[in-house]
Amino acid sequence: MTKKTIRLLMPQWQGGNNPNYSFGAELLAWLAPDNDQPLIHVPIQAYNGTPLENENGMNGRKQLLEQLEAAQHIIDAHKPDRIVMFGGDCLVEQAPFAYLNERYGGELGLIWIDAHSDLVRYVGYDNGHTLPLGNLLGEGDEEFAKHVKIPLKPENVFIAGLAAPTEQETEAISEAFQRLGIAPAESDTEVIQRLGIKTAGTKELTNSTKSIREWIKESGIKHLAIHLDLDVLDPKAFRSLLFANPEAPYNFSPAGTMQMPQLLNLIKELSEETDVVGLGITEHMPWDAINLKNLLGEIPILNK
């Protein structure tokens, strides 16, 4: 029986409160290989120059909930077996992965390839893209979590590439948090330990991916979704990341250190180990293309 696969383009920017995420998503979808999978656009409220309203501790809460529901309606209408998501900020992952967990009887495996856990609310840093994995586990933000009909099992989740901040990064993050009054409601480590989620950093995975293979086997993962936040990559090697902003450093979390060949090998290995039914790629920030696009937008002869 043929499996039905759909691609979603969700250029959501409100979760990271950065309009550049929209262009990053569109370019990502354009770069992906062509095939016969339909590409469906999830409607997003475009940036109009008005700052997002902070509603109950989240910037753009209203828009984000509306966009989540729009994605859910599209997915439910198509009833796919597999979903590819091009984002956008990390919060775009909630609708497809929640659906896939329902589709596969609450037994979906999820590997979260990300420099950050996306489990924890940061008071004072009120952007929704810090919480998608928490929401999928039935925690995170209560209003978003209630849209997850069957929360993922913590034992079916593995966080790969989780960054450990360097001493210099720790100092910069601490200074930024103190200056802006930012504090986590609960530390990443506390949440990971409380829920019993397995993790591995990039260095460990460079030596061996045995921990992931064992997790797939021990947890009986038959269907797997892959979340890929491109910020797991080393910004010195791959420049299209929030952390590689040529004009302003990003000092709110540690940068990733994974190299692209390692990332590709990991995804290929996962595809051999089990049935990959979901892939979401997020947080693409192509600074050179963004700046060139802005330049072209200001040249008179191109705008007559």
Per-segment meaning from a language model:
Residues 2-84, 92-105, 177-304:
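Catalytic cores of soluble, metal-dependent hydrolases
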Residues 82-156, 160, 274:
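Active-site histidine-anchored catalytic micro-motif
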Residues 115-116, 162-163, 231, 284:
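Histidine- and/or cysteine-centered catalytic micro-motif in compact active-site loops
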Residues 119-120, 165-168, 234, 286-288:
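Active-site environment of divalent metal-dependent phosphoester hydrolases
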Residues 121, 156-166, 259-272:
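A short, hydrophobic secondary-structure junction motif
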Residues 122-123, 170-171, 236-239:
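Short, well-ordered secondary-structure micro-motifs
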Residues 147-177, 181-188:
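Hydrophobic, aromatic-enriched interface-forming segments
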